């Protein structure tokens, strides 16, 4: 039979005494590392303390009662102090003023309120679930637990002229009769609790408080003083005196071993609390002190997790910034240099149990300014040492991973580096040194292998570099770890990272011979190889001139006519041009060798037959380190800009004297490396006059040269253009450029120079959705010759490419095409981003300059625009331009979008809307858009957007337009113009007007020459018709003498233009036609002489304007035709969401604004928004799980506004918390059932 006697029913007090860990935590004393105050040092120190969590908690409950009274006193008597006394015997007293407890009897329970609060379980004033409450108490246990676990407990309350006294003993079982008396109403309200914890129950052998617990309580009271710095908190009559949270945070700043002090803590205080990051000079385990509403959460919680994530997010930002400079940090290790303090005031905080050791509810963090924290973290003094240790660690990992420093055998290298062809001999002899020839690609490797003799292969290995090498300046080992080419090269040489070499004797090869193409890309590869070795092993290069050597091959070979088999080789264009100037009448044929693949094997054998004759030895000195830093260090942007701005990209050539056997770093940088940089910029940055890049200019020139109105496949045209224009960079890139030049959707080209026949792309993906080049056709558009008149062609300066005249250095269109179509490009140290403007406005601007306005005046009237755009351009708060789409908001959350900023694709917009759908902002999207029109219906959650500014921002319907111009000036130098586009207008105006002057002079001269020929012809014909010439008896000599005698004009040193005419030329009909031609030519000369260059320009502009106006009319009509009618898309609008009316800015002073098509709308101040600023770390964060990735910005379109998304997750509460919450709601009804529910 089961023994029934083991089943017990305990009273609530007995349950607390028997199972205190459920209510106050463990009552066993344990060794716990924690912060305590060291009076000798005046600092917080991390020590292991003997802590009794139960004892700490019952003291804490009384302290929190006092702290809660701060909140209660806001509406009553102001609270000014909390006084705590701890006697040597262990008796504890907590006293505070403020609002106090009402000394009245409860009508329901017939007892005084203080008696209920301090002597009856589940009594509380915090059951109303006030959402704004910031008290710590929630469950109605609090001070009663302290009473139960004390041998004696007394309370004195003085409130509003009445004073209450009551005491309890025997663990709250025995109580005195409440004593209430009247006192002077002027006396301050006071609440005083005095108790003697049952130290024996807590396991203290001497029945008194220990020294460690005194220190723990001292620290706990300091936390309370820091939390409520406006209240005077005293311990044993000594105030702590924290004026601000900074005073408290400084206590955690500890000096280093050498006495050096760390920087001041980073402290930010907001309405809902304070957060501090206290730096330490040495690493330690992550240490976080968290306090919520005065509760010290010894086990952390959501607020501690969120505070650490703010720090880690700032460190992530720092890591990304440093990564650009090749520097690496371990954010986890750097975070260990900080002690984090987070003291919050929160409404209705929830904890995992009655002990309140861990916060589990959602928190609202102080919004830490991003810029301030980023700058603070970047200035930490320990970062440099940390980065050095990371470099050492990474070097060790790389040495281990890639096997550097090991003298691997050829057999081992066969499997390690498959592309390496190792020298057959393992050592040098007195005559030959082991040389590793590094080639640019496999074709150059083949040339070297096929050209080296068997004897040379004993001492020469060959290794091809494929792909692009990486810049490892500043010992960027993280980048090196991703560059397999350099790793294999170092392994082949036997180099070890971090080791200092003074001699190459211990390496596998004693020389590195770089063999690249003789073009700009070859120069770049040489520079990257030199940079890598000088950065990682500078001593190797400085002590061994020629360790890196450069192999020089001819760039031009000529065969001189008339001299049998005489071939002259030139290793530089400078030498070749010098020879041309010395032999102006020489007849020769030239072959150009810009790529090593052009050389035959026979020629390669010639190069290597006397190999040393073609080798230049590189000399490196210590001072060269700074120069290479300037070229390759990402921080030296301004130096590189100045360096390149002084050079001419279109006239410069590599100017190294190849006849010399030594090459200094200075000569290499300033004479060869700069050539690569300039060529790279020339490919990416447009010319100010024609707005074209070299590839675009080649395409235009070849298409004009083609003289065909028939369209051709893009794939076929690319081959033709490559051939006639000497294009050397692959037809794929050329095809892509052809496609882009033909795109004419809104946001593509305002003026398309080529006609798109087929799928050339659309607004769906901003042109990236075009068909393959083999399927689409193109030809010149009607705008090409309107902008680039044929009469201009003979007056342009053409480029000599390998002996053939190809495209002009730059065209001079009738309008600055750069402003019509805009330009985007990223070069070497320079970038450009110029928006497009309406071509008719650009034409109006040119006309205004012709009429005398300055470029500075005119440019103020130009507003960025895309032809066909149906939205508006509005002035921004910082005077910038903002392209704004168009929408209408209707009832029931329906929103119709009829235009997007032209730089936003439809696909990017849909992607952005999808991300909003995931956060339930958008509930449905219906897209009716086409190739060049926007027509999208949305259903948005009602109330999610309250103003038009929120609609534009959240839906990415506004886009800032940046102007940051860099162009090539007319003389070919790089010219940063920033946001001022007036130089473009002025440069174009000067060049175009000069061209008209020269064109007029040339046309008059040509007409006068034609007139002279016609008049000479008429004179000869009249002489013949008068019978003075007998053709039957005449000889060639007599006819020539007759022409000389008549004073006729010579053409091409003869008179064939007259004497080779047919007999019908002398008829009456031909004579009359000749007379008419003379009259017509005379009239043309007269008209042209009366026509000024300006009038010629205006005539060309009139033709263009008329054609473009018709083109724009048809384009806009086609866009509007595709859109659904307003009867379908319309409806009752929501006034608060209606976009502001168009209010135009006043025109620039003195400008004829009416002559411009596009006008900017003035800045509209957004209505008051409830959105929180986004330039901070922190804010509302989730209560469960990691929040480090919460709030990632949504990117709907390039440069679109971004919005934070916060994921909220359900918090899993502990069983104790659930019981406490339920018990608090139901008061005492379930108290007898607690043991059954728990166990």
Swiss-Prot record:
Its cofactor is Mg(2+); Mn(2+); Ca(2+). It is found in: Nucleus; Mitochondrion matrix, Kinetoplast. Keywords: ATP-binding, DNA-binding, Isomerase, Kinetoplast, Magnesium, Metal-binding, Mitochondrion, Nucleotide-binding, Nucleus, Topoisomerase. Residues 685-1101 form the Topo IIA-type catalytic domain. One of its GO terms (molecular function) is DNA binding. The active site is at 775 (o-(5'-phospho-dna)-tyrosine intermediate). Binds two Mg(2+) per subunit. The magnesium ions form salt bridges with both the protein and the DNA. Can also accept other divalent metal cations, such as Mn(2+) or Ca(2+). It is an enzyme of class 5 (isomerase). The keyword Transmembrane helix does not apply. Residues 1167-1206 are annotated as: Disordered. Gene3D superfamilies: 3.30.1360.40, 3.30.1490.30, 3.30.230.10, 3.40.50.670, Histidine kinase-like ATPase, C-terminal domain (3.30.565.10), Topoisomerase II, domain 5 (3.90.199.10), Topoisomerase, domain 3 (1.10.268.10). It comes from the Eukaryota. Mg(2+) 2 binds at residues 517, 519. One of its GO terms (cellular component) is kinetoplast. Belongs to the type II topoisomerase family. This is DNA topoisomerase 2. It comes from Crithidia fasciculata.
